[in-house]
Every structure is written in structure tokens, then in C-alpha cells.
Amino acid sequence: MIYIVVTAISMIISSIIVKLKMKSYWQILAFLPLTFLGALRAYVGIDYTTYSIIQIPGILNGFSHIKFEPLAKQVVFLGYYLADRQHYFYIFSLFHIILMWFIYKYISENSKNISESLFLLLTSVFFTFSLSGIRQAISTMIAFYALKYLEKNKVFHFIFFIG
């Protein structure tokens, strides 16, 4: 039920922005409900428990057997610091903000109808998958976003984003 409400809110915001003929960067407001939904989750998806019990404590304690990308490690340290070393809420929030930023950029640059794209995002498996595999979802969106550089023959930019 919450997905239906969040989808409706996001689509309404997007439609209002289009009707008021506001500049396209205001469409980011339509992505805020999705960002909050992902950030406010707790014990949703397999990665929440795995991250909370094994991976995040391992990274914070410097265990070398925990394999995380360099950016993901920095997100863990920053989120834990922002939470005053009390909880992992900010870590999951930052991960979801990064994901939603790339989704927003990709959709806003490639979609003719952002409301429909939001609907497809929420009714496909990608958004719900992102609640179980946040780092994989971020990697996928960065790769999709970076494809524009291949189209423009800017291979270095593409490699920079996916590297």
C-alpha cells in the first residue's frame, strides 16, 4: 500500500510541475517521496540485516575481508560520523540519496514524461530491488547514466563513472 501512495504522490508532484511550466530541475521534488521511502526503511531487504550485522561493523572496524567499493566505504564512514556513531540510519539514507540522484538524472535527461517514468520505476522490480541490493542498484544506475558518454564518444568520462 505504501508504494501506491508514494507513487501517486510522486506522480502528482511531477504533474503539477509540468502544468505550472516550472523549470525541469524542479522535477527533483517528485523524487523526494521515493528517497524518503528508501531512507526510512528498516529491516527491509536482505542487505539491511547483512549490512547492519556484518558489513558495516566490519568496515568501521577495519576488517579487510569485508569487500566494499571505495565510494561505499566513504558513505559508511560519513553516515556513521553524521549519526554521531550511534546508528546506521544515515548510512542507508546516503546510499539511497545517491541512488535516487542518478535515477533522477537519468530519467530527467531521457524521459519525455517523467510521471510515466516514475510509474514504471515503481511498478517494475528495480525500485523494490534497490531496497535489497542498494550497492548493486547504485552501480546499475551509474552505468545507465554513464551510457550517454559513450553516445557522445567520450570514453574517458564513461570509464570514470563506471570505474
Language-model regions, residue ranges each:
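Loop-to-helix entry region of an early transmembrane alpha helix in multi-pass inner-membrane enzymes
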Residues: L82-I98
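Membrane-interface transmembrane helices that cradle and orient dolichyl/undecaprenyl
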Residues: A143-F156
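Transmembrane-helix motifs of polytopic, lipid-linked glycan transferases
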Residues: L94-N110
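Start-transfer (signal-anchor) and selected internal transmembrane alpha helices
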Residues: M1-P33
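Membrane-embedded helix bundles of polyisoprenyl
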Residues: S115-G133, A137-F144
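Short hydrophobic/aromatic helix or loop-helix immediately within or flanking a transmembrane segment
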Residues: T49-P57, F63-D84
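Membrane-interface alpha helices of multi-pass inner-membrane proteins
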Residues: F126, V155-G163
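Transmembrane-helix signature of polytopic, membrane-embedded enzymes
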Residues: M22, I28-L29, I107-S124
